[in-house]
Structure formats: structure tokens, C-alpha cells
């Protein structure tokens, strides 16, 4: 008992019992590279009961996440200050135009994507079991119990055959012009852009974002889509034609239930 009293007195004198709990700062949501390029999809809200039933939110033209960047002033050199008037990062050739290297510069991307995947699997399995026993014989005669003897003959066969195949192909070609939204420390350019086309019963759009090397841009200020790193290409549409290509709410509900 004396030890407990002494320990309590010691803690009260040292002030350990009056220490306030350390407050841990709340976790801050950082902006990822994907959010910076494509926008935060978690912040998108449904436009009504139609989008709720369709289980999707259609993109809109003029989305701030895809808005162009218009610099208010000329960007400074992205190379470290060395005191020299010569900058190796801005060397131009006598036979081509100056290449985009700053925020807001425009680059044309030639879309030429062809992908194809084929998969096929076959499975055949079989198993058979046989078991038998001759009648018991005692003294040269079969041992019987009424009409039955002690013999049996069992056989079992299990077979399974499965065949699965999948074939998928995608192709897109065309052009889209994008803008530089960021210049990385190594000189690579982060680009982003979209194109909207209004049709009779809806809109079609193409969106592209990714990272490119200035050296891959040709003399026509064009770069192939297969030269874009971390490329995200979207080609879809909105409106009646888009809705007709998807099953309705009840069809999706019963398919999930089954």
C-alpha cells in the first residue's frame, strides 16, 4: 500500500498525470498525378435520377479538370541558372521549327492504336473407380444369407469437359491537339487535351493525357500516340446513341441477381 501511495505522489509531483494527449493532425488528401491530369472523379455529382439509374455520370464539355492553361506571362527557363547565355535545352535545328517546351504550348497527337487479345482454354478430366468382391465360400460352398451372398460389384465414372475462348480487339485512329500543363525536372512534358464533336442526337469526345519527350516531337509538331507515356485515351459519347448501347436498369438488375 505504501508503494502505491509513494508512486502516486511521485507522478503528481513530476506532472506526468497532467500531460495532455498528443493530437495527431488529420490526414490531408494529397492531389495525385492522376487527379491533376484527369480531375478528381470522386467530386463528380450525379445530374439526376437518369444518371442514377444508368449508374454513370456523363462527362461534360468545359470540365475544369480538362480546361486549357493560358499562361499570363512568359515562362522562365526551366534549366538551372549557370550564368551562361547558352542553354542546351533550347537548341534549335536549322531544318525544323522550334519545339514546344513551355506550359501552354500546343502539340498534335496522332492517334494510331491497335490492340488485340485472344485467349483459349480447354479442359478435359475423367475419373473412374471399380470395386468388386467374389462370393464368400466356406467348405467349398458359397456362404449365403437368405437370397443374398456377400459379393458386390461397384463402378463409378466422373467426366468433365470445358471449353472457353475470348477474343477482343480495339482500334482508334485520328488526331487530337493537346496542351502542355506541366514541365518536369527532366524536361519531359505533361500534356492534356480534349476534343468535342456535336452530332444530331448527342456528343462525341476524345480525351488524352500523358507524358511525352520533346525529342519525340517531329518537325510537324506531331507526336505518335505510342510515344506517350502513361497515356490515358478516352473515346466515347453522350446522349441517346450512348444510352441505346447499354442495357437498361432492370436488365442489369436481373443479370446481377442471376
Swiss-Prot record:
Which cellular compartments is it found in?
Answer: Cell outer membrane; Bacterial flagellum basal body
- Superkingdom: Bacteria
Query: PROSITE patterns from the xrefs?
Result: PROKAR_LIPOPROTEIN
Keywords for this protein: Bacterial flagellum, Cell outer membrane, Lipoprotein, Membrane, Palmitate, Signal
**Subcellular location, principal:** membrane
Q: Report the InterPro entries cross-referenced here.
A: Flag_Lring
Q: Residues bearing covalent lipid (N-palmitoyl cysteine)?
A: 16
User: What's a GO biological-process term for it?
Assistant: bacterial-type flagellum-dependent cell motility
The UniProt record lists lipidation (S-diacylglycerol cysteine) at 16
Query: Which Pfam families does UniProt cross-reference here?
Result: FlgH
Instruction: Describe its membrane topology.
Output: Lipid-anchor
Q: Does the keyword Ligase apply?
A: no
Identify the GO cellular component terms for this protein: bacterial-type flagellum basal body, distal rod, L ring; cell outer membrane
Q: Quote one Gene Ontology molecular function term.
A: cytoskeletal motor activity
What is the annotated signal peptide range for this record? 1-15
Known role:
Assembles around the rod to form the L-ring and probably protects the motor/basal body from shearing forces during rotation.
Subunit architecture: The basal body constitutes a major portion of the flagellar organelle and consists of four rings (L,P,S, and M) mounted on a central rod.
Q: Sorted alphabetically, which NCBIfam families does this protein's record hold?
A: PRK00249.1-2 (NF001302)
What HAMAP family does UniProt report for this protein, alphabetically? FlgH
Family membership noted in the UniProt record:
Belongs to the FlgH family.
- Supply the name of the protein: Flagellar L-ring protein
Amino acid at each position: 500500500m505504501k508503494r502505491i501511495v509513494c508512486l502516486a505522489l511521485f507522478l503528481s509531483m513530476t506532472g506526468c498525470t497532467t500531460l495532455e494527449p498528443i493530437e495527431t493532425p488529420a490526414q490531408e488528401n494529397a492531389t495525385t498525378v492522376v487527379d491533376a491530369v484527369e480531375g478528381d472523379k470522386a467530386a463528380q455529382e450525379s445530374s439526376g435520377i437518369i444518371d442514377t439509374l444508368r449508374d454513370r455520370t456523363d462527362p461534360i464539355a468545359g470540365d475544369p479538370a480538362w480546361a486549357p492553361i493560358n499562361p499570363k506571362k512568359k515562362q522562365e527557363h526551366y534549366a538551372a541558372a549557370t550564368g551562361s547565355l547558352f542553354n542546351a535545352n533550347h537548341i534549335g535545328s536549322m531544318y525544323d521549327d522550334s519545339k514546344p517546351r513551355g506550359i501552354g504550348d500546343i502539340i498534335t497527337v496522332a492517334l494510331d492504336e491497335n490492340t488485340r487479345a485472344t485467349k483459349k482454354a480447354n479442359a478435359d478430366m475423367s475419373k473412374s473407380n471399380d470395386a468388386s468382391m467374389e462370393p464368400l465360400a466356406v467348405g467349398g460352398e458359397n456362404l449365403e444369407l437368405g437370397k443374398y451372398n456377400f459379393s458386390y460389384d461397384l463402378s463409378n465414372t466422373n467426366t468433365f469437359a470445358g471449353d472457353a475462348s475470348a477474343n477482343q480487339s480495339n482500334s482508334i485512329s485520328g488526331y487530337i491537339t493537346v496542351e502542355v500543363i506541366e514541365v518536369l525536372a527532366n524536361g519531359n512534358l505533361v500534356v492534356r487535351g480534349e476534343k468535342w464533336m456535336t452530332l444530331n442526337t448527342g456528343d462525341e469526345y476524345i480525351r488524352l493525357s500523358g507524358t511525352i519527350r520533346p525529342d519525340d516531337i517531329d518537325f510537324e509538331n506531331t507526336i505518335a500516340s505510342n510515344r506517350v507515356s502513361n497515356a490515358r485515351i478516352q473515346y466515347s459519347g453522350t446522349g441517346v446513341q450512348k444510352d441505346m448501347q447499354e442495357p437498361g436498369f432492370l436488365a442489369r438488375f436481373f443479370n446481377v441477381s442471376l
